[in-house]
Each structure stands twice: as structure tokens, then as C-alpha cells.
């Protein structure tokens, strides 16, 4: 019923944006498939980062005479407050709500109360289960994300820790020992999965790697990575990564638009013609950001987002986020190329496209970033529209995400990394490199070695280890892709990451299912 209500209200809201807010050029570009305006079924901004430090300092605020609370005195209380806060904010935003410095800001509570790993695990288990309850609109779990510093950051080392809204007589730097307790407890909960052996969708966990990372003494972390593909690995010194991997506090994305560059390439008579068309359609996208920002500011002032209003005064510091879909197919359909992204000429052209867009965005008066948009639905949406209008367009019924290689290109992860690292660093918003593994990995030390190798030898800002796993209703978790349970011979559920988080393969759209069937996983 919640999904039906969301669907019906979404159609009304989409019609409002397209008929009452956007002008004919923007509306037609969206309807015709030249571009796609994300979250058009919602009257909100996209994703946002919030200050966990502020929540610890002030507690939950009183808004419109609703229930408020004092700052948490204990970790168990704080975990409940975080669940409530993220659920509340999700109702005023369309996508990810994130906390940075999750571990750094929680460890003083462990230090103060001298909590054991078991006690911390119980608190975090409550948080994890609470955040996965379908409490947001449409009977969905809040789309939440947390970032782990792993080591206390330099800016926190000499800073007085905060517990119960007050400064303590110790600093965050005094809590490095408790960081290990929190990490072990968190990933112990992740490793258990739910009662049926399924992994937790949320929160999406991102972790900053560093040159001093203790690779061979983080068993719980790499077990979670091998079993459920958690976390995302961020290379902090290489790029200050934002996006759905966690915006900084009081920053985020107010809207996302993805460009159909496959159509642009197919219709263009030459490379020069392509860039003229790209310039024109990106102008339309940028104008849509200006319109949406104005509308959101008006609605914020009118009181439509009361909890958001308690923290920000406008959306002027929030990014418009531009993305592209189908670079591989664009190269295949370009008259001057006719080659996929494994080809050097296609790679050179793709870099020219990314550099063109980055140069254009840097010269904007408004804040706009370039993102490898997840676009799990848009990949199929664009391909279906184009197939009807232009039957000769080459595709497999979907377009490849952003500048990714075709999923059947190679089973050599290091070849793929070598090609992708230049592309990945062009995205100022968010991107990731997924290491797809179909068979699963039983040895956590092998995962640790793989992560270490990628971190030390390839310049990718974000990457994931993405094993496929299976679940039998009766026998629970099964390693790797197993369509039939070896114990009872019943059909299983297959799980893999679809553009950001894990979902049951049966719930993927038609295009993404086709992509999964063609996917050549990496040999590890």
C-alpha cells in the first residue's frame, strides 16, 4: 500500500514539475529522452550530509512543537537518535542522508562508559536493524550512509570530545583504542546479516584508507567485505570524495540530471557536431538546476521542509549534479569511432567528453558537479526510447553506466583498473569502481591483499569488492552465485550490487538483469 501511495503521488508531482515548473524545452528534453531529471516524482532535494557532531551536541531539535530530546548521554541512546534523525530527514529528501566521522564521533561514548566489544555490538545492532526498517515514504528503508575515518583525523586529535552535549576532560585523540572496538563491533554485526542470512542494505558504509592501514589485523572488516561487499573504500589522500558516498555536513545535491550521450553520438555527423549537441543539451540541464534551486528555496521558506529548515537557510550551497550514461555505447555508435571503450581511440574521445563537461561546469556561477550517476533505471529507460526511435542504435537493451567498460569486456581486474583510473578521477561528484566477483571469497586475507594491491597501485578514488552471494530460505547464506541450494535443492535468492547497494536479482529491472547475465566477473 505504501508503494501504491508513493506511485500515485509521484505521478502527480512529476506532472507538476513538467507542466507547471519547467519550461517547454526542459520538459521536452526529459520526455523525449535527451536527458533524464532524477527524482522528478518528488518535491525535494536529492541527497545531503548532516552534522553528527551537532546531533551529539544538541540532541533532536524541537520543530513545529514535535517531540524533541536532549543530547544523548550513552551510546545506546545516541544510536536510537541517529535512527530517528535519518528517518526524519529522509522524509524531506529523495536520496541518501549521510553522517561523516561516524566512528570518530561515537568512540568518546565507548571511552566514557568503558564499553566492551559486546556492549558496543549490541548498540550498533540496534542502529543497523533500526535503519533498515521500511519507515520512509513508499514503505522503504531510509537511504542512509556513514563514513568511517578509521583513524582519528588530525583535526580531531587535540579537540575535546563531546558526550551528553558537553566537552569532556579527554580528547578524540585519546580514543584511538576505542576505534578498534567500534570497528570490530560494527563489522561483527554486518557479518551476521539478518536472521535469514541476508546482508543489510543500509547504511552504505564508506571507509577511508590510509598508507598506515593495518591490512592483516582487520579480520572482521575483510570478512564483511568478502561476504557482503561492505564497505566502499575511499582513498582520501587522492581525492576528497563526495556524492552518495557521503557529503560533508550541511552540503549535498539538490538535483541530478543524466545526459543521453548515446543518442548524441548516434545523431552526430562528426566529433565536432557531437560537442555542439553536447553543449546544447548540457545547457538545458544546467538551466533545470537553476529552476529547481529557486523552487526548493521558495518551498523551504514556505515551511515545506521544517526539519531541513532547522539546519539550513537555503539550497544555494547545494550542488546541481550532472551525469552521463552509456559512454561505451556512444563510442560504438559514433560514426567516427564505431569501437567500444576497450579501444584506445574510444578512451581518448571519452576523456575529451569528460574534460569538456568539467571545463563547462567550472565556469558556472551556480555549484554543479560531475557524477557517475548510478542511473540503474535510466540505463534501460534511455535504451528503450532510443530503440523505438532509432532501431539501428547498437545496445543490449540497456546502456552501460557512465564511463564503465562493457561488462563482458574483460575478466582481468587490473586491465580494467588501468583503463578506468583516468576516467574515475574526472568525476568531481561521485564515482566508484566495482570489482565484481561471482564465486565469492572464503579467505578474508585474500580480500585484504586485493584491496591493498588496488589501493597502492591504482589511482581510483573509490572502489568496492562486490561478491555475488546467495540465500536459501531454509539454510541461509551461501557463498557465491548458487541458483540451487546444495543442501535442499530449492531455488535461492541471488544478491549483487546494483548501482550502489545490494538487491535481490529478481528485483532488478529488465535491463540490469540482462547486464548481469552478460557480466564477465573478474578472476581473482
Model features per residue range: what roles?
Residues 1-316, 337, 343-494:
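Conserved catalytic cores of very large enzyme subunits
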Amino acid at each position: 500500500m505504501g508503494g501504491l501511495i508513493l506511485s500515485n503521488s509521484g505521478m502527480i508531482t512529476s506532472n507538476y514539475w513538467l507542466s507547471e515548473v519547467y519550461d517547454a524545452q526542459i520538459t521536452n528534453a526529459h520526455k523525449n529522452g535527451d536527458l533524464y531529471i532524477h527524482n522528478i516524482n518528488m518535491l525535494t532535494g536529492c541527497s545531503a550530509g548532516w552534522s553528527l557532531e551537532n546531533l551529539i551536541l544538541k540532541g533532536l531539535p524541537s520543530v513545529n512543537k514535535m517531540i524533541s530530546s536532549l543530547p544523548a548521554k550513552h551510546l545506546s541512546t545516541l544510536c536510537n537518535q541517529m535512527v530517528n534523525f535519518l528517518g526524519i530527514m529522509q522524509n524531506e529528501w529523495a536520496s541518501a542522508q549521510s553522517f561523516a566521522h561516524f566512528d570518530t564521533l561515537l568512540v568518546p561514548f565507548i571511552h566514557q562508559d568503558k564499553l566492551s566489544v559486546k556492549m558496543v555490538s549490541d548498540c550498533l545492532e540496534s542502529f543497523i536493524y533500526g535503519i533498515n526498517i521500511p519507515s520512509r515514504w513508499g514503505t522503504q528503508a531510509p537511504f542512509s550512509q556513514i563514513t568511517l575515518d578509521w583513524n582519528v583525523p588530525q583535526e580531531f586529535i587535540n579537540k575535546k570530545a563531546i558526550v551528553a552535549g558537553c566537552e569532556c576532560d579527554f580528547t578524540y585523540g585519546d580514543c584511538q583504542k576505542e576505534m578498534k572496538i567500534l570497528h570490530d563491533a560494527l563489522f561483527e554485526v554486518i557479518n551476521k546479516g539478518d536472521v535469514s542470512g541476508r546482508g543489510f542494505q543500509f547504511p552504505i558504509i564508506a571507509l577511508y584508507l590510509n598508507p598506515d592501514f593495518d591490512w592483516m589485523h582487520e579480520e572482521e572488516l575483510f570478512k564483511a567485505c568478502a561476504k557482503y561487499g561492505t564497505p566502499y573504500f575511499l582513498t582520501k589522500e587522492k581525492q576528497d570524495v563526495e556524492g552518495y558516498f557521503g557529503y560533508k555536513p550541511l552540503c549535498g545535491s539538490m538535483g541530478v540530471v543524466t545526459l543521453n550521450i548515446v543518442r548524441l553520438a548516434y545523431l552526430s555527423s562528426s566529433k565536432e557536431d557531437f560537442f555542439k549537441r553536447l553543449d546544447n543539451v548540457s545547457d538545458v540541464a544546467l538551466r533545470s538546476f537553476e529552476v529547481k534551486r529557486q523552487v526548493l528555496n521558495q518551498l523551504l521558506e514556505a515551511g515545506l521542509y521544517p526539519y531541513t529548515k532547522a539546519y539550513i537557510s537555503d539550497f544555494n550551497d547545494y550542488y546541481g549534479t550532472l551525469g552521463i550514461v552509456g559512454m561505451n555505447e556512444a563510442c560504438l555508435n559514433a560514426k567516427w569511432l564505431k569501437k567500444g571503450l576497450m579501444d584506445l581511440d574510444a578512451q581518448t574521445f571519452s576523456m575529451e567528453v569528460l574534460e569538456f563537461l568539467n571545463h563547462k561546469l567550472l565556469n558556472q556561477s551556480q555549484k554543479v558537479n560531475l557524477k557517475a550517476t548510478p542511473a540503474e533505471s535510466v540505463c534501460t529507460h534511455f535504451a528503450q526510447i532510443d530503440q523505438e526511435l532509432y532501431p539501428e542504435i547498437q545496445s543490449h537493451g540497456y546502456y552501460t553506466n557512465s564511463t564503465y567498460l562493457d561488462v563482458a569486456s574483460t575478466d582481468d581486474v587490473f586491465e580494467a583498473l588501468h583503463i578506468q583510473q583516468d576516467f574515475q578521477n574526472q568525476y568531481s561528484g561521485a564515482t566508484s569502481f566495482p570489482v565484481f566477483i561471482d564465486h565469492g571469497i572464503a579467505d578474508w586475507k585474500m580480500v585484504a591483499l586485493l584491496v591493498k594491491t588496488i589501493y597502492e597501485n591504482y589511482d581510483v578514488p573509490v572502489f568496492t569488492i562486490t561478491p555475488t552471494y546467495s540465500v536459501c530460505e531454509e539454510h541461509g547464506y551461501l557463498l557465491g552465485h548458487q541458483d540451487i541450494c546444495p543442501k535442499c535443492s530449492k531455488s535461492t535468492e541471488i544478491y549483487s550490487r546494483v548501482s550502489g547497494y545490494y538487491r535481490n536479482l529478481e528485483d532488478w529491472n529488465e535491463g540490469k538483469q540482462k547486464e548481469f547475465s552478460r557480466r564477465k566477473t573478474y578472476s581473482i
